């Protein structure tokens, strides 16, 4: 792309998620491209998108030998009945489709970030992979109000920070998955997260106790009036004195 905004040219055209950096002098870029189930292949590209050097192309054979399997990226429908939302599903180690598995949701509602991104090395992947190793099905979901989508999607919980990520969307997605996959026991669902995820986990079990049977809230910011007020005001507007974010 030229400095005046003209001449925009796409140099990659595939289904991968790309993370590219270029040196100050330009001329080439280092591109790391992956999906949720394909590790990042790192290459040096020239200005036309042609591969100059392949730096690394890791595989998953060693992980699979330990019982690991990649998460499935899925699409579901939000609680409004029309908005598409996305998530990741980890099958338990030793998966048997004839069994029924309890579900653990690992939540991080943002709203400054998203939880179930499209790349291989997304934030907090280690936790649900550990739950899968222990015999649980694990999910991560990005409901309305999380980042990385349209402005309208992100603004869903603006001024309503307590509902960042739209917990009702998470419930709708898990129930939809339960209909899609009978081996998911949606009568036994737990939830956990840290920081904003800890807040969301506690709120989930208090607000929807009929659905979430147990919650583990780690380092939750349960009073955003005293936790990084500057951060909270980005997504809630200016906090009044003694304001409480439900």
Task: Report each predicted region and the residues it spans.
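Non-catalytic accessory segments flanking enzyme active sites
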Residues: 3, 7-99, 123, 129-133, ...
């Amino acid at each position: 792309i030229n400095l005046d905004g003209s001449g925009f040219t796409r140099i990659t055209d595939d289904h991968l998620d790309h993370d590219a950096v270029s040196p100050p002098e330009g001329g080439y870029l280092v591109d790391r491209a992956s999906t949720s189930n394909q590790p990042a292949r790192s290459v040096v590209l020239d200005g036309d998108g042609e591969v100059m050097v392949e730096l690394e192309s890791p595989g998953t054979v060693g992980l699979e030998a330990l019982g690991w399997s990649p998460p499935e990226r899925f699409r579901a429908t939000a609680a409004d009945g029309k908005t598409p939302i996305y998530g990741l599903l980890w099958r338990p180690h030793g998966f048997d489709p004839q069994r029924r598995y309890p579900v653990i949701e690992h939540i991080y509602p943002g709203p400054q970030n998203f939880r179930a991104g499209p790349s291989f090395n997304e934030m907090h992947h280690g936790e649900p992979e550990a739950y899968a190793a222990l015999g649980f099905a694990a999910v991560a979901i990005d409901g309305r109000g999380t980042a990385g989508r349209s402005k309208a999607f992100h603004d869903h919980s603006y001024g309503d920070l307590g509902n960042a990520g739209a917990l009702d969307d998470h419930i709708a997605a898990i129930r939809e998955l339960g209909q899609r996959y009978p081996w998911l026991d949606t009568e036994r669902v737990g939830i956990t997260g840290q920081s904003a995820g800890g807040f969301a986990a506690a709120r989930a079990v208090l607000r929807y106790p009929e659905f979430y049977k147990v919650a583990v809230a780690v380092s939750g910011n349960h009073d955003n009036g005293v936790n990084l007020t500057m951060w909270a005001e980005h997504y809630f507007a200016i906090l009044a004195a003694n304001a409480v974010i439900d």
